[in-house]
A protein has these predicted regions:
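Alpha/beta-hydrolase fold nucleophile elbow
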Residues: 170-182
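Short, surface-exposed "cap/lid" segments of acyl-processing enzymes
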Residues: 82-133, 137-142, 266
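Glycine-rich nucleophile elbow surrounding the catalytic serine of serine-hydrolase chemistry
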Residues: 180-192
Length: 329
């Protein structure tokens, strides 16, 4: 809420049975002064219901609305799923979700960032559970399909969460593996480089968020317009110069990272209609040229044309688990 002088502002929730109007008197006022999730006191019924939420405000000025999330309650034992957690920016109330599986408590710690998702949830849970090593899964529920895990406070919270679990497990950065597919490659590469992880494994990398927006009209018409909402969170204007500055800033920061002890595994689409520069920029980056290892494979087609690019990702993960950490299977 910005520049809004109000005598009253609140959220009111009330429910009604399917096919009925319900009773507006039976409503619940939601506390807008907290970033904590709030439980609606609803009892189980055999028939379906609709929950309606209305914003009540009185005053003059500008009102800014964000996403409203409706989830099953876990009764104090987690968010999203049992054991899940929320990392919340206290100023904007934006959040990302995280789930930690301690596995067998032996190295490494696998960190995975979910790709673009309309439904809230964690990707790759079965895959990393089958590895048996500790894993930390992230999901970004912001905007329509996620926001590439960007934002100064969100970035800080994500890295703090990773380092906290490394410390609790008694691991070092040499026992940290960062993973991501598509939208998840941006944070895997960015935070993996900043933390000097042992390895970074990504499939279908997207690193140039400004460039993705610039080529949308000709290369990807009427698809993924959400990129303009995402970029507007990173820059005040969406001019060509401002969009180019987003990517320039990413690569300037990336180049300053120390990758001398980091292995990189990159699977990319040769005709990617989102970011066809990511592999080129990575392979020519000064920090990557000093990396301990840089392995890559290109697949013909656009971003979502060939599922083999994901199979290659899984194969490299299992190969790394066996060769570097003695894990078989």
């Amino acid at each position: 809420m910005s520049n809004f002088f109000v005598a009253l502002h609140r959220l009111r929730a009330f429910y009604s049975p399917l096919g009925g109007d319900g009773d507006p008197a039976k409503s619940f006022i939601l506390d807008m002064d907290t970033s904590d999730e709030q439980d609606l006191p609803l009892k189980p019924l055999e028939v379906g219901r609709l929950t309606n939420v209305q914003l009540e405000a009185r005053g003059q000025g500008v009102l800014i609305l964000g996403n409203l999330h409706l989830r099953w309650s876990r009764r104090g034992v987690g968010h999203y799923i049992v054991g899940g957690d929320r990392l919340v920016d206290p100023q904007t109330r934006e959040e990302v979700g995280v789930y930690f599986n301690p596995g067998d408590l032996k190295p490494p710690l696998n960190v995975y960032f979910s790709g673009a998702r309309e439904l809230e949830g964690f990707e790759a849970y079965p895959l990393f559970r089958s590895v048996h090593a500790p894993s930390l899964l992230f999901t970004d529920p912001r905007l329509e399909v996620g926001q590439f895990y960007t934002g100064a406070k969100i970035s800080e919270l994500i890295k703090e969460k990773i380092m906290t679990h490394l410390k609790e497990l008694g691991f070092t950065k040499d026992q940290l593996v960062m993973n991501g597919i598509s939208m998840g490659t941006y944070p895997a590469l960015k935070y993996g480089a900043e933390l000097s992880a042992h390895a970074i494994i990504v499939s279908k990398p997207i690193t140039n968020l400004g460039y993705v927006a610039l080529r949308g009209r000709l290369h990807r018409p009427d698809e993924f317009d959400t990129i303009f909402d995402i970029d507007s969170q990173l820059t005040k204007k969406l001019s060509i110069a401002d969009l180019n500055m987003i990517d320039q800033t990413f690569w300037e920061d990336f180049t300053e990272c120390d990758l001398t002890n980091t292995k990189l595994f990159i699977a990319y689409m040769k005709d990617d209609d989102y970011d066809n520069l990511a592999y080129h920029d990575l392979s020519n980056n000064r920090a990557v040229k000093k990396a301990r290892q840089f392995i890559y494979k290109g697949f013909p087609g656009r971003h979502n044309d060939d599922p083999e690019v994901v199979s290659w990702f899984v194969s490299r993960l299992k190969e790394l688990m066996q060769n570097d950490f003695g894990r078989k299977g």
